[in-house]
Every structure is written in structure tokens, then in C-alpha cells.
Amino acid sequence: MASDLLCCPGGTDRFDHERTGPGPAAVSTEQFVWGRMKSAVPLGAPRD
């Protein structure tokens, strides 16, 4: 599902031709990658 959001510019609804992008509140690819890296830290491990 997350891959659909990253690959499809309009989000998961591929048939909505009026939208041209994910919108102003969407997470950029860089923010998404950093968020995934931080979530991969095991519970109980020290974080930044």
C-alpha cells in the first residue's frame, strides 16, 4: 500500500484524473525514508 502511494502521483486512486499530486501535506520521499529508518530501530534501543 505504501508503494502505491510512492509510485502513483495521485495516491492509491489511480482513476482520479483531476489530481496532479499527493498534496501539500504529503510526506516527501526523503522524510519517508528517514521515518522508516527510525522505525526500524528495535524497541528499547537509544534514539537520537
Curated annotation (Swiss-Prot):
Transmembrane segments: none annotated. The keyword Ribonucleoprotein does not apply. Induction: Part of the phoAT-phoH2 operon. Disruption phenotype: Deletion of the phoAT-phoH2 genes has no visible growth phenotype. The keyword Cell membrane does not apply. Keywords: Toxin-antitoxin system. Probable antitoxin component of a type II toxin-antitoxin (TA) system. The probable cognate antitoxin is PhoAT; the toxin gene can be expressed in the absence of the antitoxin gene in M.smegmatis strain mc(2)155. Belongs to the PhoAT antitoxin family. Interacts with toxin PhoH2. This is Probable antitoxin PhoAT. The gene is phoAT.
